[in-house]
Curated annotation (Swiss-Prot):
Organism, as annotated: Lacticaseibacillus paracasei (strain ATCC 334 / BCRC 17002 / CCUG 31169 / CIP 107868 / KCTC 3260 / NRRL B-441) (Lactobacillus paracasei)
Gene of this entry: ruvA
Lineage, top ranks: Bacteria, Bacillati, Bacillota, Bacilli, Lactobacillales
The protein's name: Holliday junction branch migration complex subunit RuvA
Pfam assignment, any one: RuvA_N
Localization of this protein: Cytoplasm
Gene Ontology BP term (one): DNA repair
Amino acid sequence: MYEYFEGIIQAVTPAYIVIDVHGIGFRLLVANPYHFEAGEQKRVYVQLIIRDNDQTLYGFEGAADKRTFNQLLTVTGIGPKSALAILANVSSGGLATAIAQDDVKFLTKFPGIGKKTAAQIILDLKGKITTDGQPAAAAIAPVASDVDSELADALAALVALGYPQRTVDGLTDTLKAFSAKTTDAYLREGLRLLSGKA
């Protein structure tokens, strides 16, 4: 029904943004709200999901993420919230690489994704997830072998999110000193450091 909205970002919250299009404010659930800035002119790709009596608009920074979102919805066990949570943690290209490599362990890092659902994602979407119309070619970069598996997984996730390998490598010692117990804790700290919020 809608391909994209173009207008002024009026509000940014932890879960959604509001975009003003010719005086009408649309609330869009997005993967990473803080990638948007209030007051900026922005084109946001959208997908309307209608379920029962509920109509929800989902927003995306690019057409590739919108395509990936809709492809994820074709997988048994994946709903809009799960699809958005995946996109909040990995780029379309990173997801394509994980699927191409049958990386169940990587996929199970996403909220609500167990081994069974991860295997289903690989089965249903292998060779289908694309970036700008072409299968993603970038591999998930290997990380140093002298870090524990939780930290290594977090560093790989940061690269998959699109951060430069050199930048991520520069966080290794800082995150090692952080001594977190889980991949999620390392990932959150890495994102905090990369965002410049001390």
